[in-house]
Design a protein with these regions (language model features):
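Structured, hydrophobic secondary-structure cores that serve as assembly/anchoring elements
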Residues: 1-115, 126-128, 157-160, 245-544
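Detector for intrinsically disordered, low-structure N-terminal pre-sequences
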Residues: 2, 90, 167, 171, ...
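Short, solvent-exposed coil/turn linker segments
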Residues: 52, 170-171, 187, 225-237, ...
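Extended, beta-strand-rich, solvent-exposed assembly scaffolds of outer structural proteins
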Residues: 55-58, 110-191
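Gly/charged, well-structured mid-domain segments that form the phosphate/adenylate-handling core
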Residues: 181-184, 198, 207, 474
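Charged, gly/pro-rich, cysteine-poor intrinsically disordered low-complexity regions
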Residues: 189-191, 196-210, 214-219, 442
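Long, low-complexity, polar/charged, intrinsically disordered or flexibly structured peripheral segments
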Residues: 205-244
Length: 544
């Protein structure tokens, strides 16, 4: 663009830069898929972005305890944020068996809830539980009843949670009053709602001789042969419902996430689908072990059946059994960790994936994605240590480590730490370049960064000026990684190479609109084995 001149002197013209700055991609956005709160999830089957566990409680109802609906998802999200996580996507699922066809009626919004009916004079108070009651039973007490029976307090207890509503009154008039049962409780309580029975709320309350009992809608699952609500179809889909890991699914449409978790799920078909999905999305999948798997086989004279040792689950000795799928985009962590359940106050085993994902995020923030998320600095928070069956010594871990099983260990004076950084292909000689978690995650980070930052190249003239601009942009990005200590080598030329010229893009490529870019780099590998050699100097005199 020419400069319009009029007076003798100096004119300044700002020119657009031909260089394009590359913005690094995020590294620790986690995606969680699993069963969410059966009564308080706003929308099942939809990916929702959250930035705290408070956000999770808003959209998915928070923690719960149930022996029918698996509660690993909320526990994993809870541990993720406690251990350093900051951003996540969550897809909450409802067991398809609770659909009202061949199992219990659909639970929660638009369906049914467990109920408890308290009789009053001329009517009743019908309480609906907003929490599963098959594992923890809510307690509802009407106390401090005035002589007239028209004023009383309601105390609701569920595990460690207690709610008190004082000065509730009967009867309920035609116009809502601040002390009506439904006005005081509904929309405020996280544990129950209340409604009038078929005869209305009644006029007064007199304590009964026997306490009323809950009617649990999920109890029919036992009668129909379902001891658990789990089904692989909830994750993989069926003829009428697409799976979470299929193209154009709600999670597939999320532009970028880095970590994929299916907390507590060990079904081979679901794990295989999750790993394949992670590979397609350039993400890394953190796999949980079976909850009861011990570190080593239980020796005789233990009575059968005994839980399958973790190494036999990864590589079964029995012909025809499914092996844990191999993938450079995944890692297995073992064992389950003990942690206090905020719902019940009891110490229970929890799947390790949520803890580990938080450690990934914390390590990325403090050291970088190229640092192995393992070592004494990876102190796992909110756990009292591994379950007893997962406690091991160095020799026992050595056997597991060679089978790509990353262990969580408790060391005296340190606490519980991540003590392994191998991918699922580490034991395969054909995939040794992807043996270590940080090497694979650094590669995925570079791929995601370049994919997001090179869109400007599309439809540009495919010739030398474009090639120079591409090389300049990528080289600047790789140089920044080198200066942060992400790459091996004493000089930039030792650490990385970027080529985009006539040697990578031929005239034939140009003719069909292809530009080829070659980015080579030398990743840092973790010091997994530290060998100390000690020699004694012979012939020395005492005190020399």
């Amino acid at each position: 663009m020419s400069v319009s001149t009029s007076y003798p002197g100096i004119y300044i013209q700002e020119l657009p830069s031909s260089s394009h700055a590359i913005v690094p991609a995020p590294t620790s956005i986690a995606a969680f898929v699993g069963y969410s709160h059966p009564y308080q999830t706003a929308t099942f089957g939809k990916a929702v972005q959250i930035f705290s566990f408070t956000d999770y409680q808003t959209y998915f109802g928070g923690l719960f305890s149930s022996g029918i609906t698996d509660a690993s998802l909320p526990r994993a999200v809870y541990q993720f944020f406690l251990n350093g996580g900051s951003t996540a996507w969550v897809v909450g699922l409802q067991p398809g068996l609770f659909g009202g066809t061949d199992g219990p009626a659909r639970l929660g919004p638009g369906g049914v809830y467990p109920t408890l009916t308290i009789a009053t004079t001329g009517g009743s108070l019908v309480f609906s539980s907003l929490q599963p009651i098959d594992s923890v039973t809510p307690s509802i007490r009407l106390t401090n009843v005035r002589t007239s029976g028209t004023v009383f307090d309601v105390i609701v207890t569920y595990g460690t949670q207690i709610e008190t509503y004082r000065g509730i009154t009967l009867p309920v008039g035609t116009k809502p009053a601040p002390t009506d049962p439904n006005v005081m409780i509904n929309g405020i309580s996280k544990l129950v709602t209340v409604a009038a029975g078929s005869g209305g709320y009644g006029t007064s309350y007199t304590a009964p001789n026997t306490a009323p009992a809950w009617v649990d809608v999920t109890a029919t699952s036992q009668a129909t042969g379902y001891s658990t609500g789990y089904s692989a179809d909830d994750f993989l889909g069926n003829s009428s419902t697409p799976g979470i890991f299929e193209p154009n699914s709600t999670l597939d449409n999320v532009e970028i996430f880095n970590l994929l978790l299916i907390p507590g799920i060990t079904d081979n078909a679901v794990v295989s689908a999750a790993l394949a999905f992670a590979e397609r999305k350039r993400a890394f999948c953190i796999i949980d072990p079976p909850p009861q798997a011990p570190a080593v086989a239980v020796p005789p004279p233990a009575k059968p059946p005994q839980p399958q040792p973790i190494i036999d689950w990864v590589d079964p000795p029995t012909a025809g059994s499914y092996m844990l799928p191999e993938s450079q985009n995944g890692a297995l962590y073992f064992p389950y960790l003990l942690s206090t359940d905020p719902v019940t106050g009891n110490v229970i085993p929890m799947a390790p994936s949520g803890f580990v994902a938080g450690i990934y995020a914390a390590t990325d923030a403090s050291r970088g994605v190229w640092k192995a998320p393992a070592g004494l600095a990876t102190n796992v928070l909110n756990t009292t240590g591994p379950v007893s069956s997962g406690i091991m010594n160095d020799q026992q871990q050595g056997v597991l480590n060679l089978q790509s099983i990353n262990c969580l260990r408790a060391f005296s004076g340190v606490g519980t730490v991540v003590w392994g950084a191998r991918t699922l292909v580490a034991a395969n000689p054909a995939y040794q370049q992807w043996m270590y978690v940080p090497v694979r995650r650094l590669t995925l980070f570079i791929e995601q960064t370049l994919l997001a930052n090179l869109r400007w190249v599309v439809f540009e003239p495919n010739d030398e000026p474009l090639w120079v601009a591409i090389t300049s942009s990528i080289s600047a990005f790789m140089l920044s990684l080198f200066r942060q200590g992400a790459l091996q080598g004493s000089t930039p030329s030792d650490a990385f190479q970027v080529k985009c010229d006539s040697t990578t893009t031929s005239p034939a490529d140009q003719a069909i609109g292809i530009v080829n870019i070659v980015v080579a780099f030398a990743p840092l590998k973790p010091a997994e084995f530290v060998v100390v050699q000690i020699a004694q100097l012979a012939g020395q005199t005492a005190g020399a």
